[in-house]
From Swiss-Prot:
Residues 169-405 form the Radical SAM core domain. CDD domains: Radical_SAM (cd01335). InterPro entries: Elp3/MiaA/NifB-like_rSAM (IPR006638), Methylthiotransferase (IPR005839), Methylthiotransferase_CS (IPR020612), Methylthiotransferase_N (IPR013848), Methylthiotransferase_N_sf (IPR038135), MiaB_methiolase (IPR006463), rSAM (IPR007197), rSAM_horseshoe (IPR023404). PROSITE patterns: MTTASE_N, MTTASE_RADICAL, RADICAL_SAM, TRAM. This is tRNA-2-methylthio-N(6)-dimethylallyladenosine synthase.
Length: 715
């Protein structure tokens, strides 16, 4: 499962970002949820948070290092997920010793798999629960506190659908909706079916009722979740519902009839069960997004057979062809495993060939991770790490070039974005905001004070990179939404609002700039457009190099040097070049050799280094031009004055000194501009950080939202 095209998406296990505090000021016990792994775990974590809040706990304040209750929702797909869990548990051990009232709970797939090992490796853990009984968490915490003993409860079968539990959603504008739990496939690399169980499907009525409820709360986008969504309908939990192979296509069409639902996504389908009725439903239902994430895993039929993936490369490519025929602009992404046991160079070459033919918008690539308990762990031909790494790097290089070409083709196109929060890791530094296009691509656009996460904007793509797009041309349209209102509640920024002077022609200084940007009442102030332009120019200046304005001043240095040295007449028929070259009797008599040497130095430094500064855009060369011209020009003047041979009114090589002083003034001006620019950029970054903090709705700690699940955790 996946959404999003960032570079980090290739390796989703980055460790959770920790959020902080212990006891709430009111005395209510606080909690913190740290999530590892796939979207299914993210969905479950929202339910865990909802259960704790329903039981009277309060989410820990943003920035807190720990809380009264810390819950780890774990992943068992890759070995590094194990390592990160136990590393974080070890980090909490001293806190647990110093605060015995603190409780630690471990749930999810790893807890389901290693129920005894968790307490053996981390005996300070209070609760261990599995994937099938997340609704038991509040009871288990209370029981552990009362009995002063660890509680381990692992159910072997699903007790209730997580979607029926209370939820504390991470987003006001987007929501996960689980349509099934478990998986009926038996991929040899995957441990998930043994941990999540056989597939069980929710009834369409239950799913649609949840979607309508979410839309009534202001949600604009839902993602339908399942380990294999296009197997939906084969194993309904309600025995009264007949087996229905076409149920998923009908579910998509039914979502299209819900008023107010702007976008529908789903993840993940299995190629073996992908049918044309789903393609037709995607193409014919306006709010179903033109995006498809369909795991390939390998382009080699031999490896696919060893993986027990019941399709072959040509079938997979045929599905892609039919999707693109129905939706030419669909973004298709995939999962790929490198280094599966027995993979030969020929097998890997077949994968590269399929990647070239498929032209994926993005591919989430993973190095095979040997997991005990899976059939693949017992296969012969385990690939050396160095070989896997080398193949992985080649695959990533190929896919990045394809992704870049695909994104570059979008430059100049108009896109609709659902403005997101937390998507752009550098938004605060670049004074940008981020959003997702309908095809799932991540777009960073110029920040606008009126736009909130959850709003919809249209803009034009101006730049491209392999994992994101840039839209710096400004916003064409902006639609405020109830989800945006939820992210910017009334009065949330009252403390930062101050009275600003009325609009005028005066350019604001830093303090006035902050006043303008902080005050929501000024969103129509025409000064803001000019200020945003100033910020962009400031960023370029601070980043280094000589900007277009500075280049004009350096050109003026060249003009003055040339005028002073060659063109302007001095006295009578003696001109500048006569002074420098000594070609005229008057020039030779007027200026001795040392003066001419210094005059030449002034010319070389003024013209030569100023020209180099223009070509290379290096400020250091401009400073050399300044220093050399000033020294040479001043020395030439002193040489002339000391000999007292200069004709009356003849400035001679003193033009070098004049040019030097002009250069001094120009560079002082440029230095002041850079100082101003740094101030503006710093203020912009501070303001953006303040906005992000104000918009953050919760502090549940998610490892990688939105990040792809490892292919072994999906289909």
């Amino acid at each position: 499962m996946t959404c999003g095209f960032s570079r980090a998406d290739r390796s989703p296990y980055h460790g959770p970002v920790t959020s902080t505090v212990a006891r709430d000021v009111s005395g209510v016990r606080t909690y913190q949820v740290r999530t590892y792994g796939c979207q299914m775990n993210v969905h479950d974590s929202e339910r865990l948070a909802g259960l704790l809040e329903a039981a009277g706990y309060r989410r820990a304040a943003e920035g807190a290092e720990v809380a009264d209750v810390v819950v780890f929702n774990t992943c068992a797909v890759r070995e590094n997920a194990d390592n990160k869990l136990y590393g974080n548990l070890s980090h909490l051990a001293p806190r647990k010793r110093s605060n015995p009232q603190m409780q630690i709970a471990v749930g999810g797939c790893l807890a389901q798999k290693d129920r005894e090992a968790v307490l053996r490796r981390a005996p300070w853990v209070d609760v261990v629960f599995g994937t099938h009984n997340i609704g038991s968490l509040p009871t288990l915490l209370e029981r552990a506190r009362h009995n002063k003993a660890a509680q381990v409860e692992i159910a072997e079968a699903l007790q209730q659908f997580p979607s029926s539990l209370p939820s504390a959603r991470e987003s006001a504008y987007a929501a996960w909706v689980s349509i099934s739990v478990g998986c009926n496939n038996s991929c040899t690399f995957c441990i998930v079916p043994s941990l999540r169980g056989k597939e069980v499907d929710r009834s369409p009525d239950d799913i649609l009722a949840e979607v309508r409820s979410l839309v009534a709360d202001g949600v604009l986008e839902v993602t339908l979740l399942g380990q294999n969504v296009n197997a939906y309908g084969v194993s309904f939990a309600d025995p009264a519902l007949p087996r229905d192979r076409g149920a998923f296509a009908r579910l998509l069409r039914a979502c299209g009839e819900i008023d107010g639902l702007e976008r529908v996504r789903f993840t993940s389908p299995h190629p073996a069960e992908f049918t044309d009725d789903v393609i037709e439903a995607m193409a014919q239902t306006p709010n179903v997004c033109p995006a498809l994430h369909m795991p390939l895993q390998s382009g080699s039929d031999r490896v696919l057979r060893a993986m027990r993936r019941s399709y072959r490369a040509e079938r997979y490519l045929g599905i892609i062809d039919r999707v693109r025929a129905a939706m030419p602009h669909a973004a298709i992404t995939t999962d790929l495993i490198v280094g599966f046991p027995g993979e030969t160079e020929e097998d890997f070459a077949a994968t590269l060939d399929v990647v070239r033919r498929a032209r994926f918008a993005a591919a989430f690539t993973f190095q095979y991770s040997k997991r005990p308990g899976t059939p693949a762990a017992e296969l012969d031909g385990q690939i050396p790490k160095a070989v896997v790494q080398e193949r992985y790097e080649r695959l990533v290089e190929l896919q990045e070039s394809i992704s870049l070409q695909g994104n570059q083709a979008l430059v100049g196109q108009t896109v609709e974005l659902l403005v997101a929060t937390g998507e752009g890791r550098k938004d605060s530094a670049t004074a940008r905001m981020s959003g997702r296009a309908r095809d799932g691509r991540l777009v960073h656009f110029a920040a606008d004070d009126r736009v909130r996460p959850g709003d919809l904007v249209t803009t034009v793509i101006t730049g491209a990179a392999p994992h994101h797009l840039i839209a710096d041309a400004g916003i064409l349209s902006h639609r405020r939404t109830r989800a945006g209102d939820a992210h910017a509640p009334a009065g949330a920024r009252a403390a930062s609002v101050s009275a600003c002077p009325p609009s005028g022609r005066r350019r604001p200084g830093p303090t006035r700039w902050m006043c303008l940007m902080n005050d929501d009442r000024n969103h129509d102030d025409p000064r803001l457009g000019a200020l945003r332009t100033e910020i962009e120019a400031a960023e370029r200046r601070v980043a280094g190099g000589i900007d277009p304005g500075a280049r004009g001043f350096v050109v003026s240095i060249l003009v003055f040097v040339l005028l002073g040295s060659f063109i302007l007449p001095h006295t009578g028929d003696v001109r500048g070049w006569d002074v420098l070259f000594g070609t005229h009797d008057a020039g030779a008599a007027a200026v001795a050799l040392p003066s001419r040497v210094f005059g030449w130095l002034a010319l070389v430094f003024g013209v030569g280094f100023s020209t180099l500064a223009l070509v290379t855009r290096r400020w250091a060369l401009a400073w050399i031009a300044l220093a050399g011209t000033a020294i040479a020009g001043a020395a030439g003047m002193l040489a002339i004055w000391s000999r007292q041979t200069v004709p009356a009114g003849h400035p001679g090589p003193g033009w070098g000194l004049i040019v030097a002083w002009i250069t001094v003034l120009v560079l002082i001006y440029q230095w002041a501009r850079v100082v101003w620019s740094r101030t503006i950029v710093q203020l912009a970054a501070e303001e953006q950080r303040r906005r992000v903090a104000a918009q953050q709705q919760s502090t549940t700690l998610l490892d990688d939202l939105p990040k792809p699940e490892d292919p072994a955790a999906g289909t």
